[in-house]
């Protein structure tokens, strides 16, 4: 062999990624056998675990959690606790949503917030209420009752003395209609 042939083979050794002359080797794949209901299926160690972050799975887990909380609260109906919150800034809304996610009822009084901040906070709470299947009811001019899915609220339809708005939420933007 000449020096040039050796040099070419040396270069080919490092430049080729795949040798097409070798036959394809099939890897051993794990074989799953039927498992009794009392046993848990064992995952093979060589397969990477797949994280399932799909929207449907999250919704299913959320619905299951809500059902679990509803069943749990039906069993323990000794006392009902309603937390009263006076948010002073928009960032306090996340704490209120955490309480709702923990299956607690919250009475919210927006008297220490400006109207713009209260409207923004109320929009956030309303969105969280829909996601967690809760209820948001206006009980006074600046007070709202936020309850989880398993709590039923019966509010008498009364008119407050200073209430001139027709909507359910007092912090909605007022629009002047031109006729």
From Swiss-Prot:
Keywords assigned: Cell cycle, Cell division, Cytoplasm, Septation
Gene Ontology biological process terms in this record: division septum assembly; FtsZ-dependent cytokinesis
Biased composition (Polar residues): 34-53
Subunit structure: Homodimer. Interacts with FtsZ.
HAMAP family, per database record: SepF (MF_01197)
Function: Cell division protein that is part of the divisome complex and is recruited early to the Z-ring. Probably stimulates Z-ring formation, perhaps through the cross-linking of FtsZ protofilaments. Its function overlaps with FtsA.
Pfam families: SepF
Subcellular location(s) per record: Cytoplasm
Domain of life: Bacteria
One cellular component term from this protein's GO annotations in UniProt: cytoplasm
Main location: cytoplasm
Protein's name in the database: Cell division protein SepF
Chain positions covered by the region annotation Disordered: 22-53
Family: Belongs to the SepF family.
């Amino acid at each position: 062999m000449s020096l040039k042939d050796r040099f070419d083979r040396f270069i080919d050794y490092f430049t080729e990624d795949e040798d097409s002359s070798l036959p394809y080797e099939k890897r051993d794949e794990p074989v799953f056998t039927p498992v009794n209901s009392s046993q848990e299926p064992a995952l093979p160690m060589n397969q990477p675990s797949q994280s399932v972050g799909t929207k449907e799975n999250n919704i299913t887990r959320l619905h299951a959690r809500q059902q679990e909380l509803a069943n749990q609260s039906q069993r323990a109906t000794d006392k009902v606790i309603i937390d009263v919150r006076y948010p002073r800034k928009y960032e306090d809304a996340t704490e209120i949503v955490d309480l709702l996610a923990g299956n607690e009822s919250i009475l919210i009084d927006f008297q220490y917030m400006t109207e713009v901040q209260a409207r923004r906070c109320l929009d956030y709470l309303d969105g969280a209420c829909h996601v967690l299947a809760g209820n948001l009811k206006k009980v006074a001019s600046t007070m709202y009752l936020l309850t989880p899915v398993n709590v039923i609220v019966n509010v008498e339809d009364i008119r407050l003395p200073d209430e001139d708005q027709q909507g359910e939420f007092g912090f909605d933007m007022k629009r002047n209609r031109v006729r």
